[in-house]
Regions:
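N-terminal pre-domain/capping segments
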Residues: 1-67, 71, 75-90
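Active-site acidic/histidine proton-transfer and metal-coordination neighborhood
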Residues: 73-153
């Protein structure tokens, strides 16, 4: 078993690795951007290189990111669904650039209909995302939820 924590990327994504080392972490989770916004500023190529270098030097693994809390792959609202899929592809792009094992995501909240229908929407959205990025090594990591109404996972 490896123990890690979610670390801030304030000052650059590579700083999260340094913070993890200070706290004795063996694994790491980060947000690659503000988790309460749809889009983030592009990752600095120099920071990407430094992050990858620091991960390799420290042996911290696995390193993962957590997707924006705004993403809802279970929604039946077309505009929100499209925005969620686009945002999730962006999350995967960022994680792939950083060499992360995966992106942790809350699958979504059922906004209408049966939970089974919402689960199909989630699966369909993940298929769309993988079709958009078929060669990526970064995995989608579904985070379970408990006792949060119609939140699925």
């Amino acid at each position: 078993m490896r123990i890690g924590a979610h670390m801030s990327i304030a000052g650059g994504v590579s700083k999260a690795v340094d913070r993890a080392v200070v706290h004795g972490c063996e694994a790491l989770q980060i947000f690659t951007k503000n988790a309460s916004q749809w889009r983030g500023k592009p990752l600095d190529p120099a920071e990407i290189r430094l992050f990858r270098q620091r991960i390799e030097q420290t042996g911290i693994a696995p390193a993962v990111s957590h997707a924006s809390y705004l993403i809802n792959l279970a929604t039946t609202f077309p505009v929100l669904r499209e925005q969620s899929i686009v945002a999730f592809v962006d999350e995967l792009d960022r994680a792939e650039a950083l060499g992360l094992l995966g992106v942790v995501i809350h699958p979504g909240t059922c906004t209408a209909g049966a939970d089974e229908d919402a689960l199909r929407l989630i699966a369909d959205a993940i298929r769309v995302v993988y079709k958009a990025r078929p060669r990526y090594k970064t995995m989608v990591l579904l985070e379970h939820t408990a006792g949060q109404g119609r939140t699925l996972g």
